[in-house]
């Protein structure tokens, strides 16, 4: 593996440097970025850079500035890819109300799936209420399958009837059926 070191003379240290803005090179450049550089990157870089910064900011989750920035990115970034990464990083710091607002506003299925998963981890009772309310309304098979899976983790036997009604629902790759069968065996104690 070949390593190259390049040095550039500058008047002041840049917040972050983008060597390959279009991600065309078959080389990975590792940069140690400060908190301020990551916050700047998550706001201003391209989609891949913003996603990477959102992921890397999880190391600074104790900083209030990081929490504010990631919460805003998790709901308002124009790319679902970046919103999803921010949700994964900030999940432990979000309230059940934050999750509910993010779920209602979210148009793309992958971040909604992450919202269901993270909310179930950190706010199980509120997640259970939300899942029971929205499982029949969500138009994504991926999200419905995640909701069914979470019912197996945080639900109870009263959810069995609801899950059985979804078991025979058509979905690509039978993801809802597979999720329902695993959840039913969990709740029924098999």
Positions of PLM-derived features:
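Long, helix-rich interaction regions
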Residues: 75-85, 92-190
């Amino acid at each position: 593996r070949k390593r190259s070191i390049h040095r550039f003379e500058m008047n002041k240290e840049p917040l972050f440097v983008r060597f390959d803005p279009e991600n065309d090179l078959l080389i990975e450049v590792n940069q140690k970025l400060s908190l301020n550089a990551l916050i700047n990157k998550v706001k201003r870089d391209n989609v891949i850079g913003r996603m990477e910064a959102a992921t890397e900011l999880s190391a600074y989750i104790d900083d209030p500035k990081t929490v504010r920035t990631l919460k805003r990115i998790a709901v308002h970034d124009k790319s679902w890819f970046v919103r999803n990464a921010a949700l994964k990083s900030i999940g432990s710091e979000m309230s059940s109300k934050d999750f509910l607002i993010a779920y209602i506003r979210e148009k793309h299925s992958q971040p909604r799936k992450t919202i269901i998963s993270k909310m179930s981890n950190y706010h199980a009772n509120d997640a259970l209420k939300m899942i029971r309310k929205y499982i029949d309304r969500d138009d994504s098979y991926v999200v419905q399958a995640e909701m069914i899976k979470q019912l197996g983790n945080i639900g109870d036997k009263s959810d069995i009837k609801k899950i059985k009604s979804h078991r025979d629902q058509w979905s690509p790759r039978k993801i809802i059926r597979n999720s329902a069968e695993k959840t039913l065996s969990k709740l029924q104690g098999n």
